[in-house]
Regions:
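Transmembrane beta-barrel wall of Gram-negative outer-membrane proteins
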Residues: 58-86, 99-136, 145-168
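Histidine-centered metal-chelating micro-motifs
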Residues: 24-26, 60-62, 89
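Short active-site oxyanion
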Residues: 48-52, 79
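Outer-membrane beta-barrel proteins
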Residues: 89-95, 135-141
Length: 169
């Protein structure tokens, strides 16, 4: 969640599943001793270019997804998905909430998420994803704070031909 706790860093349009484990989780998660939130994102559209735009008094977002190589039966394919959110609570607050802190809610955030997925005809796949989440708090008379979370990652599934073994990572 962002600095004021009302907005998630994850765009719900990119989520495939979210699982929360408070105890008793498997070795799949390493030696964790605390709770785990396992977030899985979906792949982009494999057949058509598609998008979504949304705006509210607090934020706006867009999502764009589509094939890099269109899906065909028994052939490899690839897709992309990108999502961006931006808040303008700092700008809209004086009009919507003039009674709160003299109309000043000095919070802004932005979220960027992207994922590329490549699928082979035989079932193997690899995904490369990245994110950039930013928060800013600007109390004009006293202090300003800003922080960023960035990350890159990969996930793969290897299905060797003629083998009963699957390699996942």
């Amino acid at each position: 969640f962002h600095s004021i706790g009302l907005f998630s860093v994850f765009d719900t349009d990119i989520l495939k599943s979210v699982d929360v484990y408070s105890a008793g989780f498997s070795a799949e998660y390493g030696g964790r001793i605390s709770a785990i939130v396992d977030v899985k994102t979906r792949d982009g559209n494999k057949t058509n270019l598609a998008g979504k735009i949304n705006a509210s008094p607090f934020s706006s977002k867009f999502l764009l997804e589509g094939p890099l190589k269109k899906y065909e039966q028994d052939k490899g394919n690839s897709s992309f998905i990108i999502s961006y959110k931006n808040s303008y609570l700092k700008n809209s607050a004086p009009t919507i909430y003039p009674f709160v802190n003299d109309g000043m809610l000095p919070y802004t955030f932005s979220d960027l998420y992207g994922k590329l997925t490549f699928n082979s005809a035989k079932g193997s796949n690899i995904s490369v994803f990245g994110f950039d989440y930013k928060d800013n708090v600007d109390f004009e008379s006293s202090a300003s704070y800003a922080w960023t979370s960035r990350g890159l990652g990969t996930k793969f599934l290897l299905v060797p031909g003629g083998s009963e073994t699957i390699v996942d990572g």
